[in-house]
Regions:
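Extracytoplasmic/periplasmic/luminal assembly and interaction segments
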Residues: 47, 62-101
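Extended, aromatic/histidine-rich regions of cofactor-dependent oxidoreductases associated
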Residues: 38, 179-213
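Ser/Thr/Pro/Gly-rich low-complexity linker/stalk segments immediately outside membranes or between
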Residues: 33-46
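Short, Lys/Arg-enriched N-terminal segments with co-localized hydrophobic residues
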Residues: 1-8
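Acidic, glycine-rich flexible loop segments
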Residues: 143-179
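Mid-length scaffold segments of soluble, non-membrane domains
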Residues: 93-157
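Hydrophobic membrane-insertion alpha-helices, especially the h-region
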Residues: 15-30
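Positively charged n-region of N-terminal signal peptides that target proteins for export
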Residues: 9-14
Length: 213
């Protein structure tokens, strides 16, 4: 009996050690996988550099050759991690195709997919996530929005974010990655306008600012 009891105690002790190791490993993983402020800063800066090179050098750039010759830089707000938010996904009931107005008066077709609900600026905000009718990856969304900086510090026709679902019922929206549509650089382009649901009553002082010739 004593031998069985000792064996049982040893087994429980081993299980306790294994559980402790699993917990320690999980905590270590969370700590090492969490993005440090320095890594986050570098990631945003790298994306901005990529964006600059595309606008400055790529043949698909919206800039004319004359604009490219005079082009010096893109204008951004300082990087602020507070503008990276985790939003709750709320599926749109009875999803339908919406004809989104373009800056030239035409329309482009998108699916009304979900609402992204998040806290920012001391209030609860909600943005409509659209999905192109030709999108093959169902986790990718198109987000066009305007806010209280629009028409002043940022482009009056709104800004865009390429959003990707990263949780079962959630999505990360990083306003530091907000960028201008092509028509902000060249009026010969036609660009989707933000839906009325996506006109925010707060200032989003993050991402790209007005383009200056």
């Amino acid at each position: 009996v004593r031998e069985n009891r000792n064996r049982s105690m040893k087994t429980n002790h081993i299980l306790l050690i294994l559980v402790s190791l699993v917990v320690i490993a999980a905590v270590a993983y969370m700590l090492t996988s969490a993005e440090s402020p320095e890594v986050y800063q570098e990631k945003i800066e790298a994306e901005r550099e990529r964006q600059y090179k595309f606008i400055r050098f790529n043949v698909e750039s919206p800039l004319t050759e004359e604009q490219k010759r005079d082009f010096k830089e893109l204008n951004f707000y300082p990087i602020d991690p507070n503008y990276k938010v985790k939003a709750r996904l709320i599926p749109v009931e009875n999803r339908k195709v919406r004809e989104v107005p373009m800056t030239d008066g035409s329309v482009e077709r998108y699916i009304e997919h979900s609402y992204a609900e998040f806290e920012l600026g001391g209030k609860t905000n909600r943005l409509l996530l659209l999905q192109s009718v030709s999108e093959s990856d169902m986790r990718n969304f198109f987000l066009a929005f305007a806010d209280e900086t629009s028409g002043r510090e940022t482009y009056g026709g709104g800004r865009y974010i390429n959003a990707r679902q990263d949780g079962k019922n959630s999505i990360t929206i990083d306003f530091n990655l907000a960028y201008n549509p092509y028509c902000a650089y060249n009026p010969d382009y036609a660009c989707p306008l933000p839906p009325k649901e996506n006109i925010l009553n707060i200032s989003i002082q993050a991402g790209e600012k007005n383009y200056k010739d």
